[in-house]
Each structure stands twice: as structure tokens, then as C-alpha cells.
Swiss-Prot record:
Assembly mode: Component of the circadian clock oscillator which includes the CRY1/2 proteins, CLOCK or NPAS2, BMAL1 or BMAL2, CSNK1D and/or CSNK1E, TIMELESS and the PER1/2/3 proteins. Forms a heterodimer with CLOCK. The CLOCK-BMAL1 heterodimer is required for E-box-dependent transactivation, for CLOCK nuclear translocation and degradation, and, for phosphorylation of both CLOCK and BMAL1. Part of a nuclear complex which also includes RACK1 and PRKCA; RACK1 and PRKCA are recruited to the complex in a circadian manner. Interacts with NPAS2. Interacts with EZH2. Interacts with SUMO3. Interacts with SIRT1.
Sites of Phosphoserine modification: S17, S85, S97
Motif Nuclear export signal 1 positions after renumbering to this chain: 149-159
Record protein name field: Basic helix-loop-helix ARNT-like protein 1
Positions of post-translational Phosphothreonine modification: T21
Keyword annotations from UniProtKB, A to Z: Acetylation, Activator, Biological rhythms, Cytoplasm, DNA-binding, Glycoprotein, Isopeptide bond, Nucleus, Phosphoprotein, Repeat, Transcription, Transcription regulation, Ubl conjugation
Matches recorded under InterPro entries: bHLH_dom, Circadian_TF, HLH_DNA-bd_sf, Nuc_translocat, PAC, PAS, PAS-like_dom_sf, PAS_fold
Function: Transcriptional activator which forms a core component of the circadian clock. The circadian clock, an internal time-keeping system, regulates various physiological processes through the generation of approximately 24 hour circadian rhythms in gene expression, which are translated into rhythms in metabolism and behavior. It is derived from the Latin roots 'circa' (about) and 'diem' (day) and acts as an important regulator of a wide array of physiological functions including metabolism, sleep, body temperature, blood pressure, endocrine, immune, cardiovascular, and renal function.
PANTHER family attached to this UniProt entry: CIRCADIAN PROTEIN CLOCK/ARNT/BMAL/PAS
Gene designation per UniProt: Bmal1
Amino acid sequence: MADQRMDISSTISDFMSPGPTDLLSGSLGTSGVDCNRKRKGSATDYQLDDFAFEESMDTDKDDPHGRLEYAEHQGRIKNAREAHSQIEKRRRDKMNSFIDELASLVPTCNAMSRKLDKLTVLRMAVQHMKTLRGATNPYTEANYKPTFLSDDELKHLILRAADGFLFVVGCDRGKILFVSESVFKILNYSQNDLIGQSLFDYLHPKDIAKVKEQLSSSDTAPRERLIDAKTGLPVKTDITPGPSRLCSGARRSFFCRMKCNRPSVKVEDKDFASTCSKKKDRKSFCTIHSTGYLKSWPPTKMGLDEDNEPDNEGCNLSCLVAIGRLHSHMVPQPANGEIRVKSMEYVSRHAIDGKFVFVDQRATAILAYLPQELLGTSCYEYFHQDDIGHLAECHRQVLQTREKITTNCYKFKIKDGSFITLRSRWFSFMNPWTKEVEYIVSTNTVVLANVLEGGDPTFPQLTAPPHSMDSMLPSGEGGPKRTHPTVPGIPGGTRAGAGKIGRMIAEEIMEIHRIRGSSPSSCGSSPLNITSTPPPDASSPGGKKILNGGTPDIPSTGLLPGQAQETPGYPYSDSSSILGENPHIGIDMIDNDQGSSSPSNDEAAMAVIMSLLEADAGLGGPVDFSDLPWPL
């Protein structure tokens, strides 16, 4: 019994001993301190195998073995922090090295006198990548020069091979910085006459905008001022000379007209001094094909002392280095033998009145005209007068039908005044929404002499023979035959004022469209594809006025004599129709510009229009709506 009491008391004393309580409270206190320390900003919680070293170290502080482990734990934390800082330092160093390497690859960063910040380097790198535009394998100019040739020898070889002249033009002001001596053979100007002058003074006025466009957008050296992101001040540059790099975005090739210095005409008669002075001062132009690159040099390297302004400090001098060659148009030569070569052709687009609205660049090699010389002019101004009648008929057909029209061979005047033989395929483009013809597309092919003699099966000839201009212009009864006026300075062969023909044909077709525009049957078809309609009844008011008043003044349909019943697409196909009494073409209005109509003719024309409205639209009586597909 006594032994049992002693065991119970010992058990109670062991249970009531403070050791476990202190251990529990110490553990809770340690964990609380550890949590507070983590909340205050401890960067990292280092744990191994999900066991907190701090808890174990705080628990066994009094134990020597525990103190040793605590010291080792603190050392590990310190080493981990140092390793983390070393990793961050290595990362920053690597990023800085990449930024420096990127700055060395960008040409604009190399020109800076001071070290740029990272944001400026990245912005310049993005700007440089945009200028490359996907160019691959950029090359340096030094790689293209053989080692055994000097610069002067290479220049002479290039000029001899190109058969032109070398010139350097500043992109900012168009100043001629250098030109080779061979320019005298082409432009008849000496080297000293051109160096230092503005290129724009020797260009045709219509080509100045085109050349300025070619000189602008310098891809090699942007002209804008660079701002430092830290200080906000402009960055000053110290340009270091190096091999300039060429890219596809800096390549230039264009045509322009330049003045040719002709020998002055000596005028001895004082009475004609005012008229001859204009001819003496007038300089002829020749077409120059310029091919080269946009490059940049330091202003000090070019030896220019005038660009010492503060704005120009730190900017490269952008220049156009090009070879200018005289561009002579290609005159087709008769082919010898039966060698088949690809025919020369160009594409042009015309308004409905025949004016050029687009010309392919290939036309320059065939016609010697630049595209801007032809734009806005009528094609009838270049047609030979013997072919105008046939081409006018083709013009009507292409406006009234959707089919392709192939013309016969005709003569087209080129720039030197001679004529070249062409054959064209015309088709009209009709707007699907407005149902109106917007423009005419013409594919013009040069016809060689042997093809013209033997005939070409690929180009079928039209059945209607070409009509000359004289056969289309009515002459007075018993009067003399019309003579074609000649214009001083313009070679013969074309007709003065022929550009009005296309406008008259367009107005004629539009007038027919207006007459037929209110007919319900024409709503689903093309407005220019007009179907035949019987003539108005003589019992109608319009018909009585027509019978009493004669033929109304309505634009002619353009039918040639004897073709009234063969050509479809006109309002009246019967020879006794209203328009059949005036079948000839109205080109004689070119010489008569009065064009005024009398009141009686206006009333007769209005009567015809009203009669057509009554006959086609049913305005003269009640209308039956039972045939409509929708309920009313």
C-alpha cells in the first residue's frame, strides 16, 4: 500500500514538474518571435526539410551542442544572403555588358561623346532596327573594292562602264557637293559650274517634288536631336569615322529631267530681241536615270565649313551618291529572221473622256514621256489624225459594253515628234454599286514592222475599217475640203484640239444614260448597256411636237454612215428613228465652240424626254400594280 502511494506521488510530481511547461512556452514564444521577425521584413525564410532552425536553436540555447548548431545556422543565413547579392550583381553586370554590346552595334550610339543611359540605347536600337526594314546581310563598301585598284581608278572604271556621271547631293538642301567631269558630255555643264549649286535649279519644275521625296527619309543618319533621358538635355556627339554601312532602305533609283546647256543664240536684230530672248534663255531638258545610295559622312570629313550652326552639331551629313545616265527611249527595230522576243508593252488607265489618270513606268522606255507628262492629257492628242475615227468608235464600244475591245494598229506620237505603231486592248471597269463606268484600262503593245506587214493572229482585226478624220467631219455643200490647222512648234500628224473628242463622247454616253435612266427595265442592267426601245407614238404630245418642229437637238449616237442597224446598244435601231436623221459623228463641234441652243430646240428635247417617260414608266395613265412581287 505504501509502495503504491509512493508511485502515485512520484507520478504526480513528474507530471507537475516545470520542464515540459517551460518547453511548451519556450516553443510558443520562439515561434511567435519568429513570426514577428518574418512580418517585419525578413527577406527570405531559409528552412531545410521543413524544419525551422531558429526554433531548434532557441530551444537548445543552453545546450553546447545546440549553440554550435545555432552558430552554423546563422552562418548559413549570412552565406545565403551573400550568394543572393552575388547573383544579382552578376545579373546586372551581364545586362550592362549586353547593353554595351548593343550600343556598339548601333551606328548612332557610336557617334555619341558620352556614355548613354540604358533607355536611350534601347530606343536607338529600336530606331535602327526599323530603318533596316528586314534587310539581310548588310555590307560595307570596302568589301566591294578590289585591293589592287585605287579609288581614282575605280571611279574611272565605274564611269566608263555606266556611261554617265557621278554626283553627290546633300539631302538637307539639295546642294551639289561633287560631280565628275564626265557631266560635260551629257549636260554640257563643266564641273565647276555645278559644284556648290542647288540641284533643284537644274531640274524640271514638275520633277522637283519627286526628287525631294527621294532625298528625304534618310535611313542612315536621322536628323532629329537626341535627348538624354536622365538630364533632359540634347546629347552632343563626337563622330568617329568608320566604314559606312549600306542597307536596302537607302537604295535609290528614279528618273528626272535636267537642264541641258545649249549654246546661246546671238541676236543681231534689235526689233526681235524680246521674242528671241525667250528662246535663247529656254533650256531643253533630257531624262536622267539616277541610281545610287543614301550615305552619311561627318561634316568635317567633307570639308564643309558652313554647317557650324548649333542645330547641326552632332549630326551626320546625309548625301545621295548616285550615277546619272542619259535615258534614251527604245525605238523598236525590225527584227531579223524569225526570232520571237517578248513584245514591249505598257499599261495605262484613262478616265471616261480619254484622259490619262495612270501610266505604267514602262511607257518611258517606249514613248520617252515621263508618267507625269502624260497625266491629265487626253489620249486623242497623241493619236494620228487618220486613226481618230476608228479609235473614237472603239471608245464608244468600250463605254457601252463590258467586253474587251481590241483596236487596229494605230500611230501614237512619241516625244521626239515621230510616230510609233501600237495596238491596244481596252476594257472598262464598272463600279458594282453605282453601275457606272469609272475608268478604262488600256494595254498597249508595240507592233514591229514585220508583224505589221505579215499580220499577227493573236490580235484579230476589227471588221470596221479605220475612218480618217476627214471622212467624219462633214464639209459644206460644194465647199472646199477642210484643212488641218498646224500649230507652230508641234510636228504634223495630230489634230489641234483633239482632246475635246473624248469629252464629247463621254457626254454623249452620259446623255443617253440620262434619257434611259428613269426606265424600270434598265434598273437591273448597266446604265451604258442600253437596249433598243420603239420610238414614241406620234399621238403623244411629244410626238406631235417632233413631227411639227423637226428633228430635236439631241446628242448624236456616234453611228457611222451605214452602221445604224449593225451596232447594238443604241436607243433606236430603226433607220426612221428620231436619232437616225442625224447619223454622223459630232466631231465637227471641235471647230465650232458656240454650242448654244435655241428655245425651240430645248422645248423639242424636253418633249422627247417627257414622251419617253410616259411610254416607259406609264405616267400617262393608270398603272396596274397586280404584277408586283410584294403586297401593297
